[in-house]
């Protein structure tokens, strides 16, 4: 094989690796959206790199390090399999789709950055309904922008840093 052909082959392989990396990052965000909607927070936490320099920043706080992120989702929010959660989640639906993606993988193939617009809605049932009271609750449009950095962690793509910027939240009605 000629030197020129060998260089072209190496470049093609690097490009394929970066394309595969981009798809892996897209899949992480798809899983994030799905797990969030399904309240599958135990699985959601597995999407994160097992690192002390991870962070998750959103309107309700900032969590630094994988242990803090685990605490956010497994203690503060809980998981659908937790005792009593089936009753707490009854009538609740939070769906945040990922849209308008911009995603770039670094030349070295070890990190990537992306952002997504997230058109979402959140429906929360009213608490403490009185006997005979018609079920009701809050339904809101809740749009945001996700800024996410990914890192290859032990050979697997994982979420490294995530920031959620709220764009607007308003009543569905």
Segments predicted by a language model, with ranges:
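A short, polar/proline- and glycine-enriched secondary-structure boundary/capping micro-motif
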Residues: 123-128, 169-173
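A solvent-exposed, acidic/Ser-Thr-rich amphipathic alpha-helical stretch
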Residues: 41-123
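Short, low-complexity N-terminal intrinsically disordered segments enriched in polar/charged residues
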Residues: 1-34, 38-42, 46-47
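A structural signal for alpha-helical segments
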Residues: 20, 61-64, 138
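Short, surface-exposed loop/helix-turn segments at secondary-structure junctions
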Residues: 126-136
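Short, hydrophobic/aromatic alpha-helical segments in well-folded domains
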Residues: 28-31, 43, 99, 145-149
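Short beta-strand edge/turn micro-motifs at domain boundaries
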Residues: 111-115, 136, 141-173
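Transmembrane beta-barrel outer-membrane domains
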Residues: 23, 93-94, 139-141
């Amino acid at each position: 094989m000629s030197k020129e052909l060998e260089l072209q082959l190496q470049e093609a392989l690097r490009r394929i690796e970066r394309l595969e990396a981009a798809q892996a990052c897209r899949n992480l965000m798809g899983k994030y959206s799905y797990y969030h909607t399904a309240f599958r927070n135990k699985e959601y936490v597995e999407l994160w790199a097992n690192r002390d320099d991870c962070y998750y920043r959103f309107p309700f706080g900032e969590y630094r390090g994988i242990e803090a992120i685990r605490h956010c989702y497994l203690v503060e929010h809980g998981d659908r399999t937790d005792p009593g959660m089936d009753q707490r989640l009854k009538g609740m639906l939070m769906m945040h789709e990922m849209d308008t993606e911009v995603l770039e993988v670094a030349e070295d193939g070890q990190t990537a950055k992306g952002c997504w617009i997230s058109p979402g809605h959140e429906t929360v049932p009213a608490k403490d309904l009185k006997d005979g009271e018609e079920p009701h609750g809050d339904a809101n449009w809740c749009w945001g922008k996700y800024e996410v950095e990914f890192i290859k962690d032990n050979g697997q793509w994982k979420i490294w840093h995530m920031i959620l910027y709220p764009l607007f939240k308003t009543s569905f009605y």
